[in-house]
Amino acid sequence: MKLIEHFLSIQGEGAYAGRLAIFVRFGGCNLRCAGFGVHLKAPNAKELIGCDTIKAAQCENFDFKDTNFSELKNIIKSHNAPNAIIVLSGGEPLLHQKNTDFKDFLRFLVEQNRQVHFESNGTIEPDFNTLPELKNCYFALSVKLENSGESKEKRINARALKSIFANSKGAFYKFVLSGESDEIREIKEILAIQNGGVWLMPLGASKNELEITAAKVAGLAIKHGFNYSDRIHIRLWDNKEGV
């Protein structure tokens, strides 16, 4: 289980934007999302293309170390932020739900009465029976659309979405849009599978890129009765990592 980074910041997007948060980012993802068009040259000289967390999603191309429960517990304590929510991100953090250290970490957080938020792509069904602590968690579901470059079969798991909304403490959708009208049609198709609150966010990994799509996406949110979420961390710190 690779630990990519951890940091204390504010939640930059979605229903809990602005909340003080400890982010713990794990490596590994079951999607590549080349359609988002972020390019990066890895230390092994491989040219990568994917999303704005490409190092986490394609961590096999980087020299990240394995982590364990003891280290993760100490990380939370080191930030000395008892009122912060805990955001488990990636990559796709649910890839690790069968890992013993991950399970121990989640149990520790729940026992400490921490508010735990998963940032997930919604394609993996949480094992609420084997790991009941997942029922105490919130899920921000960034279900991918056609603009991700992934096939519909890979990016939409109806059973997983239904299970998350039925069993978790809370869940909502957040969609990254370029501002095209077809994206709204796709969102409505997903809501027909499993309804839920929706936050629309502009596509972009930098302030300049956000400026291109933000107004158009906000207009779509207003027109179709959805919520709009800016991406505060990008507005404040541009494409800087670890914030």
Describe the predicted segments one by one.
Residues 1-66, 79, 234, 239-243:
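N-terminal [4Fe-4S]-dependent radical SAM core
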Residues 25, 89-90:
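A secondary-structure boundary/capping signal
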Residues 64-74:
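Glycine-rich, highly charged phosphate/nucleotide-binding loops
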Residues 73, 82-84, 94-243:
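Conserved AdoMet/S-adenosylmethionine-binding subsite of the radical SAM
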